[in-house]
From Swiss-Prot:
Alphabetized InterPro entries for the sequence: AAA+_ATPase (IPR003593), ABC_carbohydrate_import_ATPase (IPR050107), ABC_transporter-like_ATP-bd (IPR003439), ABC_transporter-like_CS (IPR017871), P-loop_NTPase (IPR027417)
Gene3D superfamilies in alphabetical order: P-loop containing nucleotide triphosphate hydrolases
Domain of life, per lineage: Bacteria
PROSITE patterns according to UniProt: ABC_TRANSPORTER_1 (PS00211), ABC_TRANSPORTER_2 (PS50893), MGLA (PS51260)
Protein's UniProt name: Galactose/methyl galactoside import ATP-binding protein MglA
SUPFAM superfamilies: P-loop containing nucleoside triphosphate hydrolases
Gene Ontology cellular component annotations, sorted alphabetically: plasma membrane
Catalytic activity, as annotated: D-galactose(out) + ATP + H2O = D-galactose(in) + ADP + phosphate + H(+); methyl beta-D-galactoside(out) + ATP + H2O = methyl beta-D-galactoside(in) + ADP + phosphate + H(+)
GO molecular function ontology, one term from the record: ATP binding
CDD domains per the UniProt record, alphabetical: ABC_Carb_Monos_I (cd03216), ABC_Carb_Monos_II (cd03215)
Enzyme class: translocase
Length: 506
């Protein structure tokens, strides 16, 4: 509902003032403000659990606020659904895209509001209007193409174009670059800036600090459900924003590299995957206590390396030698028995059972070892080991019966790492271990990884964040199109050198 009363000064497109929201026993929002100007890109920042999602759900009417006012284009609003918000000019591009993969691009653009000619859908008009919007936003996608054939970045372009078709004045973007290549990110930024030029106010949510400084004009920081500050980006530093988010100064983004790697524990020679296109002739050593990074552009086949080592992919050639003895991991069980562990890239889809508790999620990789002599599960040992995961990984939770899906991304990741440590691995492989995790939790994950290396674990980390690889690893193996293009020492290499190597075999 849009009220005709309470005009604003006209300086802001959206004004959320003094927003309060409580749930039983929890004050989720405490006097929170968010004010977005036209022709601006406004970062909304805070750790997971800071209140960002709750605030936006109050805006879209998914939650009803307890008190406070929301003005949009000078009029007080009180929406009761996301559909109502969209029809009135407020749109959101979610991290989990909301498109029908089996339908065409233009069907998705106009779903529920098809242009008609008599009793039938006017396909020609739908095509023309879709094409006109795409041309205006410089989007090169065939309106008739099935959405299921497109890349993630192209799907995001469609979501943005759909918002544009509703004449949205406020567009909220939630972690829009989490699965994009650098080239796709740059194209996305071009489109976002075009929306800004046309008078839109963009609310941009991201944990990637570099993007915030590259793209945004202002930032609002929330912490523990409270509004901390709204300031122009031009007057801030990365350290200042981090301090506002976590409530303390983080003197360093990465732990000190105090550990000295020991003898070689893993030798990989000419590793080639059976399924093609994939990795070819990959060779490297991993030392005891070493953190080895794997870098490369999207499509470089970084993940294929750890999946082949873990027995998910079958190798067609090459050798894997552990402590001087050649081994073959034909499946994940063999890999686990040989001391390998893999924390996968997609935490939500392949890492956790979101609706089950921390106890189940902590023990699932090792559940057979909890059977007693008569074949029953030893509940006492299971509870003890779950508590070990919670304590040693410093998981913030009310208890082991808590549903893991209710935890922050950082705490979910700690449970997954703890789960694998219960298998007592020698080689721990982590694929994008801090994706979607806030800055404070990232540092905690880095500390855990550094501590594991100090205890002699051999660690392999795949990451798309170059500062992360340079900050926590000892060496970086650079992949390009399935081939190793170089192995560099992080003490002496540069980001530009890694990018040069990553482009070598394209």
């Amino acid at each position: 509902m849009v009220s005709s009363t309470t005009p604003s000064s006209g300086e802001y497109l959206l004004e959320m003032s003094g927003i309060n929201k409580s749930f039983p026993g929890v004050k989720a929002l405490d006097n929170v403000n968010l004010k977005v100007r036209p022709h601006s890109i406004h970062a909304l920042m805070g750790e997971n659990g800071a209140g960002k999602s709750t605030l936006l759900k109050c805006l879209f009417g998914i939650y009803q606020k307890d008190s406070g006012t929301i003005l949009f284009q000078g009029k007080e609003i009180d929406f009761h659904s996301a559909k109502e918000a969209l029809e009135n000019g407020i749109s959101m591009v979610h991290q989990e895209l909301n498109l029908v993969l089996q339908r065409s691009v233009m069907d998705n653009m106009w779903l529920g509001r098809y242009p008609t000619k008599g009793m039938f859908v006017d396909q020609d008009k739908m095509y023309r209007e879709t094409k006109a919007i795409f041309d205006e936003l410089d989007i090169d996608i065939d309106p008739r193409a099935p959405v299921g054939t497109l890349s993630v970045s192209q799907m995001q372009m469609i979501e943005i174009a759909k918002a544009f078709s509703y004449n949205a004045k406020i567009v909220i973007m939630d972690e829009p670059t989490s699965s994009l290549t650098e080239k796709e990110v740059n194209h996305l930024f071009t489109i976002i800036r075009k929306l800004k030029e046309r008078g839109c106010g963009i609310v941009y949510i991201s944990h990637k600090m570099e993007e915030i400084f590259q793209l945004c004009d202002e930032v609002t920081v929330l912490r523990d459900g409270q509004w901390i500050a709204t300031e122009p980006l031009a007057g801030l530093t990365m350290d200042k924003i981090i301090a506002m988010m976590v409530g303390r100064s983080l003197n360093q983004r990465f732990p000190d590299k105090e550990n000295k790697p020991g003898e070689v524990i893993l030798e990989v020679r000419n590793l080639t995957s059976l399924r093609q296109p994939s990795i070819r002739d990959v060779s490297f050593d991993l030392h005891k206590g070493e953190i080895l990074g794997i870098a490369g552009l999207v499509g470089a086949k970084r993940t294929d390396i750890v999946e082949t080592l873990f027995g998910i992919r079958e190798k067609s050639a090459g050798t894997i030698t552990l402590h001087g003895k050649k081994i073959n991991n034909h499946n994940a069980n063999e890999a686990i028995n040989h001391g390998f562990a893999l924390v996968t890239e997609e935490r939500r889809s392949t890492g956790i059972y979101a609706y089950l508790d921390i106890g189940f999620n902590s023990l699932i990789s090792n559940i057979r070892n909890y059977k007693n002599k008569v074949g029953l599960l030893d509940n006492s040992r299971m509870k003890s080991d779950t508590q070990w995961v919670i304590d040693s990984m410093r998981v913030k939770t009310p208890g082991h019966r808590t549903q893991i899906g209710s935890l922050s991304g950082g705490n979910q990741q700690k449970v997954i790492i703890g789960r694998w440590l219960l298998t007592q691995p020698e080689i721990l492989m982590l694929d994008e271990p801090t994706r979607g995790i806030d800055v404070g939790a990232k540092f905690e994950i880095y500390q855990l990884i550094a501590e594991l290396a100090k205890k002699g674990k051999g660690i392999i980390i795949i990451s798309s964040e170059m500062p992360e690889l340079l900050g926590i690893t000892d060496r970086i193996l650079v992949m390009s199109n399935g081939l190793v293009s170089g192995i560099v020492d992080t003490k002496t290499t540069t980001q530009s050198e890694i990018l040069r190597l990553a482009s070598l075999h394209l």
